[in-house]
Amino acid sequence: KATGREILFSACNWGMEEPGEWMRAIGAHMYRSTGDIMDNFVSFTDIVKSQLNKLCMSGNHCFNDMDMLTVGMEGKGNVGLGKVCSYEEYRLQFVLWCLCGVPLMMGADLRTLAPEYRALMLNPALLRINQDAECRPPYVVRRDSVCIPNPDDAQAPWAHPADTAFVLLRHLTDNEFALFYANLSDADAEVHCEMADMGLPVTGGVALDMTDVFSGEHLGPQKDSFNPHIKAHDCRLFLCHLVKDNA
């Protein structure tokens, strides 16, 4: 403070002793909530899953820092451990960091970053969600298991791998919502969500008017349930508004 310059107080104890409960009180502007990230799918999804019940411990002036982005690192550097992520896996990571309001710090070398990852991290819709003025964290609408074929077991032809799907909803400025679906399983699958899980019963007289962030497709009003088919290790993201249900 004596310098007259603004200071960013970034605190780190690698998630020990529940930092989200007291970091704001000591003046931290952002705090590391987990161990160090590695450049692979298991590492970043384990980090996210460890924070799903702590999303409320992040907000204006004190943000949950789930570590740097490994998007586009492609196994380079000292965090390059394990199988290199696919584009869809890196996109999943970036969308989650944006949706959860995580401070966005690149680990990749900007000079050699592949064009598709540069475009991903400059996506204006995703950055707008991350930088939303109200800084509200998302909340978990549903945390579930996907249902995938299990052809090797005649007695149990369908498998339900644990903790492989979740749905998040974030309330944005101007009564807009970001609705996110993740499929963390190793197979393509539907991820299920009832609108009632978001507090929108089918008899409530309202629906969600949805637009796909990745494709730009306007899906129109959706009510009752919306269960997108999602590739393995991938996600879907929609921007939504509440509209009257005229049906």
Regions found by a protein language model. Give the residues of each.
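Hydrophobic, well-ordered secondary-structure elements that form the walls
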Residues: L179, M210, H233
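C-terminal beta-strand-rich structural cap/linker in extracellular carbohydrate-active enzymes
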Residues: G220-A247
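Flexible loop/turn segments at secondary-structure boundaries
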Residues: M16-P19, N78, M106-G107, L113-Y117, ...
